[in-house]
Amino acid sequence: MSINILSESNFDSIVGTKPALIDFGAEWCVYCKKIAPIIEEIAGEHPEITFGYIDVDLQPMLAARFRVHSLPTVLLLKDGQVVKQFLGAQSKETYLNAINEL
């Protein structure tokens, strides 16, 4: 499963109301690069979840919409609503536990 590059123009059509894990990051963010392979691995294991990446420098309105103020921020959405928020780099197990609680 691939990770969708999200923007204002495609966010609602790709994510919609499906369960989703959205990774907010930036090219300059070291910890964002650290969690990227973890998110990619989880995406391959969970095809039932929509995975997305938002570069906050390119999509500041989406960052504002979800009140993202620090990086990396990972949001877990269900029915279009944030059900879990992770600030900073987390372990694979942390993300998996949250997905399994959906």
Question: Residue locations for each model-derived region?
Answer:
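Structural signal for short hydrophobic segments within the conserved structured cores
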Residues: N4, T50-G52, Q81-F86
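N-terminal "domain-start" segment that seeds a small globular fold
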Residues: M1-S13, T50
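Structural micro-motif
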Residues: P60, F66-L75
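Non-catalytic, surface beta->alpha helical segment in thiol-disulfide oxidoreductase systems
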Residues: L76-L102
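Short active-site neighborhood of thiol/selenol oxidoreductases, capturing the structured segment around
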Residues: V15-E27
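Conserved redox-active cysteine motifs that mediate thiol-disulfide chemistry
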Residues: F24-I38
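Conserved helix-turn-beta segment immediately C-terminal to the redox Cys motif
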Residues: T17-P19, K34-I54
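Short acidic active-site motifs
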Residues: S9-N10, L58-L62, T94
